[in-house]
Amino acid sequence: MIVSDDVVFEAKQISKLFPGVKALDGVDLTLRAGRLTTLLGENGAGKSTLMKILAGVQPPDEGELLVQGEPVHFTSPRDAQDHGIAMIHQELSLVPDLTVAENIFLGREPLRFETLIDYTELNRQANEWLKRLELDVSPTTPVRRLRVGQQQLVEIARALAGNVRILIMDEPTSAITERETEVLFRCIADLKKQGVAIVYITHRLEELEQIADDIVVMRDGCLIGTAEFGELSHDAMVRMMVGRDVKILSKQSSSNNQPVLRAEGISLSHPTRPGDYLVHEVDMHVCKGEVLGIFGLMGAGRTELLECLFGLHPTASTGQVSMHDRSVRLRNPADAISHGLALVPEDRKQDGLVLSMSVGENASLASLKHAERFGFIDRGREREHTRRFVERFRVKTPSLREKIINLSGGNQQKVILAKWLATGPAVLMLDEPTRGIDIHAKNEIYSLINELTADGLAVIMVSSELPEVMAVSDRILVMCEGRATQSFDRSEATEENILQAALPRRNSIPC
């Protein structure tokens, strides 16, 4: 057993330069066995870049890495893995067409006769990890059929299944439920007892009390400070992260009672279980200038409800939708857009962006008709149309030609918002809009929501963060197992009654 105070990893004076920006500037980091080091900072602070260097994904331009006091040079993630380093990425790195078990043991599959994969043993071992994480899916299920939160748990299982000495966790709880987070924290406690050194990136400061030993704060690619947990207050950590005090913005209540969208009896059949439903007989409405928050545990049907309203399941869904008191048919997303609906999806990189394209190209994708001229795209019109929205949403980018993949998560999310606001919607649907972004970027999103609703836009927001739902929403619809179980006005909503309504029950209510 390694003594808990022993240094197992050091990064010295690490620097990394990307075109137009110095992502890391002389950063030091020390990891000790059996301790969890929390890495804090805004999006764009350099946290993920530093972790990718530690995990062998990217090489440093300057500096030195040492494992157990010995200098190392990683040319690939495999090199890092050979030194006992594993990373759980915030943005999922699973292979969609492989099964859960194949993803967990990818590259280290159990073999028969030294050449053939032993699928019986593969599935058995995978099932043990799924049980440990209390994930109720079959190891033979293709990953593409899992929801984002379930995929995140598979990503965690893959990292834990390796013989790790140093574990890097980048926002591991951003897409999982509170219960699943508790399971993960128990696994973390076990790993610490085994002498594993853990680096943990999070924007959820309330998690630190349960798991953190050491705190490292970064800002603008530089190391700002280090401390043991307990030496810094919550406000002090935030000040170090952003360089100033930050006040969480909340929604200014709307008094408008004019429905823009009304949905009645929305149901979505389960794709593999005849007679079962992912969404069942949900009634709801949202008014002009209002934020309707939708809360529920994983599997409650929140995302599927938004997808039905956006025309993504025309053959499997039923129910009536009206816009401005006129019945509409939503056979596909084009129909939804034409009727004034917009959807910011849960997984921004998979479903919301084209990563190989520029900021400007991404921002214009949903509104190219505004740039059309004689059947062709007028690039000048396209740039002018999208520039207004990119500037309004204060997207931090060197230019509209910058590749979207080079932007921070918060700025990528603002580009997606700009894309959909450029279509001139009446109803904006947001699915986990602040997932994986820092407290300052969250405040910017909240501020934009306030601005948009003040202009009369109706907003439907799905979020797994209960304090966020309560702060931003005028009304809250709670879902469980595909059904609407309760609706609360802002004045009557409490954490207790919302959570009680999120537990399994069989009543359906109008919202």
UniProtKB/Swiss-Prot annotation:
Subcellular compartments: Cell inner membrane
Major localisation: membrane
Keywords: ATP-binding, Cell inner membrane, Cell membrane, Membrane, Nucleotide-binding, Repeat, Sugar transport, Translocase, Transport
Domain ABC transporter: 9-245, 261-506
UniProt key word Ribosomal protein: no
Source taxon at top rank: Bacteria
Keyword Iron-sulfur attached: no
Sequence similarity: Belongs to the ABC transporter superfamily. Ribose importer (TC 3.A.1.2.1) family.
Function: Part of the ABC transporter complex RbsABC involved in ribose import. Responsible for energy coupling to the transport system.
Subunit structure comment from the entry: The complex is composed of an ATP-binding protein (RbsA), two transmembrane proteins (RbsC) and a solute-binding protein (RbsB).
Annotated protein name in UniProt: Ribose import ATP-binding protein RbsA
Organism: Rhodopirellula baltica (strain DSM 10527 / NCIMB 13988 / SH1)
